[in-house]
Amino acid sequence: MLTIGVLGLQGAVREHIQSIEACGAEGKIIKRAEELVSVDGLIIPGGESTTMRRLMDTYQFIEPIKAFAAKGKPIFGTCAGLIMLAKHIEDRDNAHLGLLNVSVARNSFGRQVDSFEADLEVKGLDAPFTGVFIRAPHIISADESVEVMAEYDGRIVMAKENNILGCSFHPELTDDHRLTQLFVEMVKTYKTKLAV
């Protein structure tokens, strides 16, 4: 069985685990860097990016997550997780993990009172997906190597580059598990290549 970890530092960790399990994979909360070896893919959930970075530094996650990605293991960052993955962050001198060749702007749809839901056309899905946006970032620009997966109001809100997937919204806060399933399929593909 596939095992997908959810970084358990902050955010809707339990909801991500439930979504993973609804897709037929095993979900595991990751609280220590050494636990990364036990999972085939990793979800970095939403939360507050500055706090998340501080916790990642405290628990020494930055280099182990970079090494995890370098092995080709898939990573999915949602909301603040997208900010953690981005190579460039507007109004910030340096990136956090720098694994996805995109530039992001934080809180680009407004503060928490401006949280909203929107139906999105997502590449690979046959019907719209309802995105839950909460103090969401968006992707300002993406490298040629990056596949744009979804846009909202002219802004990129989901992108994929090789084994790295990121979105501005919270797929775990709906009962629609198709985006988690998309990530599970990425992890399956990685495992299949490994077995050859």
From Swiss-Prot:
* Entry binding sites for L-glutamine: G47, E48, S49, R106, I134, R135
Q: Which NCBIfam families match?
A: PLP_synth_Pdx2
Keywords noted in UniProt = Glutamine amidotransferase, Hydrolase, Lyase, Pyridoxal phosphate
Lineage runs: Bacteria, Bacillati, Bacillota, Bacilli, Bacillales
| Keyword field contains Hydrolase | yes
Q: Does the keyword Ribosomal protein apply?
A: no
The protein's gene is named: pdxT
What is the organism of origin for this protein?
Bacillus pumilus (strain SAFR-032)
Q: What does this protein do?
A: Catalyzes the hydrolysis of glutamine to glutamate and ammonia as part of the biosynthesis of pyridoxal 5'-phosphate. The resulting ammonia molecule is channeled to the active site of PdxS.
* Protein's GO biological process: glutamine catabolic process; pyridoxal phosphate biosynthetic process; pyridoxine metabolic process
Q: Which GO terms describe its molecular function?
A: glutaminase activity; pyridoxal 5'-phosphate synthase (glutamine hydrolysing) activity
User: Which pathway does this chain act in?
Assistant: Cofactor biosynthesis; pyridoxal 5'-phosphate biosynthesis
Look up the coiled coil feature and give its residue ranges.
none
Q: Which HAMAP family match?
A: PdxT
Q: Which family does it belong to?
A: Belongs to the glutaminase PdxT/SNO family.
Give the E.C. number(s).
4.3.3.6, 3.5.1.2
Q: GO cellular component terms?
A: cytosol; glutaminase complex
Q: Where is the active site?
A: C79, H170, E172
Q: Which reaction does it catalyse?
A: aldehydo-D-ribose 5-phosphate + D-glyceraldehyde 3-phosphate + L-glutamine = pyridoxal 5'-phosphate + L-glutamate + phosphate + 3 H2O + H(+); L-glutamine + H2O = L-glutamate + NH4(+)
The protein's name: Pyridoxal 5'-phosphate synthase subunit PdxT
